[in-house]
Amino acid sequence: QKNYQEINSKINYCNSIKEWIEIYKILTYWELEISQIDNNDIYEIIESQKKEANRLFGTFIEENYKNILLDNDIDLSHTLFKNKVIPELSSERPTLMILIDNLRYDQWKCLEPDIISDYKVTVNEIYSSIIPTTTQYSRNSIFSGLSPIEINKKHSELWKNENDEGGKNLFEKLLLKEQLVRLGKNISFNYHKVINTKEGIKYYEKLENEKQNDLSVLVYNFVDMISHAKKDVNFIKELAKDDKAYRSLTLSWYNNSNLKKIITKAKELGHKIIITTDHGTINVNTPSLVSGDKEISTNLRYKTAKKINSETKKVIKIDDPSSFLLPSNYLSSCFIFAKENTYFVYSNNYNNYVNMFKNTYQHGGVSLEEMLVPFVVIKPK
């Protein structure tokens, strides 16, 4: 009862990202503790607190995001590499940076005991993704060290707009190389992306060769694949019906994954290991009708177009994308971002889409789960 009241009080008086990070840590701690006991009543209490926290967090971001982008004391996607990764690099010991796409903080806390065993934790923090909380925006910003609008201006050939064909993250290695040059870091590095089991095995088998590099970057996409598959594959939807089940699925996957083998081998080889992500994800349950021109983007948690109409107040709308450091696809582009557990649907086939995407994991919007994500550094004892 006392903890409940203290948490409620802190939620109601949060007025900085750092305070929200501390609240999210507390909520996650209690959620994980309570999920281990079979008491739905208590679990529902912490869930209701998290729901209220997300409501207030959405309002906080709506009112303060422009200032957050200007605050040099806050670690964001486009400042993460310079502020957090570069200081960890050393010629004395190779560093393996593993970016697990779509890894939430609560998922990390479930994987943490196994991953940190036999190693010393030197950094165990949370940083904030920029919005939209998607791979295109967040991860390109991490590797470039630039905001999306800066990437578009400086490297227009490497930035694809919403409706351009082709992959949106095909130039991460090139963007990282350019960032290292810009920061004056003459280091040897390599970059790999694992999107299936075969590639995971291949990387594991040649990991020993990575010792010659000061920095090895590994983007591991499997958690993202689980998240996206949830809307398509019924058995995954059944396995990950809520956050508790989603964490369990993540842990089961990790314990049988090539990623676990890679981390174990990296420890044996004496690597310093950085573990982070580009954004998280949230279970969506509240449909919201949206309409726009024919070029409107497809993501369920944010939309951009020349003109957008939405029915709910659970959105953040901006008519000047540059104020959020975002490029404009058109002269009159605008963005809307879903808050809380909302997802956008069109009037065409409304009921079909509502049922298809209800209780699925989506990202791109504004929530604690999507924006506040782990950054961890471990090294040999």
Across the structure, where does each feature detected by a protein language model lie?
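Feature captures the catalytic ectodomains and active-site-proximal regions of enzymes
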Residues: 1-381
